[in-house]
Amino acid sequence: MRLKLILFALLSILIINNSQAQYKISIEIKDNKDTMLILGNYYLSGTFAIDTAYSKKPGKFIFQKKDKHLENGIYFFANTTGRYSEFVIDNESNFTITTNEEDWAKHIKSKGSKSNSLYFEYMNNNFVFSDKVGELNKERANMTKEAYEMAVNNLRLRSDTLKEEFLKNNPNHLLSKVLIATKEIKIPEINPIYKNDGSLDSTAMQLERYNYYVNHYFDNVDLQFDGLLRTPRAVFYDYYNKYWDEVMKFQPIDSIFKYANIVIDKSRGSKQMFKYLVHDITERYLKSHVMGHDEIYVRMIKKYYESGEANWMKPSDLDKEIERANKWEKLSRGKVVPDIQCPDTNDIVHSLYSLNSKYKILIFWAYDCGHCSTEIPKLYNFYKENKDVYNVEVMAVNSGMDLKQWREFIVKKGLNWLNVNGLVANYDWHSYFDISSTPYIVILDKDNRIIAKKISAENIPNFIKYYDQGLIKL
């Protein structure tokens, strides 16, 4: 008897799992003549086709899979000409959608899906408001400015009331998550801040507003709801990217990493959202060309991947990322580079550490590198003009194989700084500095600590100027 109960329990689990891992969505379009419809969904910045259905009877289509589960989000069915209509998957996967060929969106209804019935009702009410605004615009020429604005405001108030009622009555509906996520953050009124002379400090007040915005940016976004990943890009994707690309653009490295952790922590109730955020932020700063952003990548790998929290990566790929992070960590700003010893054009060995200057510019380059042919002369002009101004010395390390061409390039361009042959060195600097392209430029202080790297020649003058003035900190 006990064995029978166990078998029955196992069978029940299998049936439940099977019912959860399938979908059946019937589409019925009156007077429709299409032979095929496409089922698609939104994901981040794109749209994706995930299924097709062919009509066995005019206007009747069935999307069905017994081995696939549809995640929560906004989906759509479309014909081959691009006409489409949206619906939601909100913990329901077996229902029927009916509509009319005349206007798919305005006639759409649902059977067997309470979530879609609510969604369609809300959207259709909004269509009514949109139509009325359109009618007002047509009549605008025959109305006074006051009458037109009053009519539009009344419609807007009714639309806002409709939204608030929906949110109140359906707080857990997918559409509610979307509507809340698209609400702008309202910055409260900032108390006046005064300077020592009694005048209003508008800069300090603006900073207060900015700090509030940074700290409350995601207040309306439920980062524990992964359904937001499968919505039109304007709902989540664009808003999320704006945070890193614009709001946090000029923040120091420590602040960016701090807020990255805060945002990620908000997603810990959702495996999918957590995975997306950790992966995106890590990749974002791996690929960034902004100096110092590689340090964020290193910290992300250490905190989430090496610790085992990000457990979705293949072991071989994980090992490569950790190896790269360990290598890049040694190249972080403030780290001391090992001494480089190479022979010059006369085979006299020189040491990086022997350069006695306030700043040292270490350049890895090649005479046959197209980018080097433009960057090296720019850098040399800076060197000539500012060598004594900032007490700067240069070690230019050659990576080209033809030493004759290397020497000819030096003479032709008049590069009167320390030129050394990197093919003969005391260690594998190419691997140590993880050089993938040239020129690769590193700026060091007198103690051989990295203060800048992967910096272009045209940005060096301002960097050294501001660093020397104490306006740039490590």
Language-model-detected regions and their locations in the chain:
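Non-catalytic, surface beta->alpha helical segment in thiol-disulfide oxidoreductase systems
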Residues: 78, 437-440, 446-474
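N-terminal "domain-start" segment that seeds a small globular fold
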Residues: 313-352, 462-472
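Bacterial Sec-dependent N-terminal signal peptides
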Residues: 1-28, 474
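Structural microenvironment flanking redox-active thiols in thiol-disulfide oxidoreductases
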Residues: 374-411, 425-431
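Short active-site neighborhood of thiol/selenol oxidoreductases, capturing the structured segment around
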Residues: 350-379, 393-395
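Short, internal strand/loop/helix patches
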Residues: 410-442, 446
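A non-transmembrane, solvent-exposed segment enriched in polar/low-complexity residues
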Residues: 22-171, 178-182, 186-227
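Structured, charged N-terminal subsegments at the starts of enzyme catalytic cores
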Residues: 206, 214-268, 272, 278
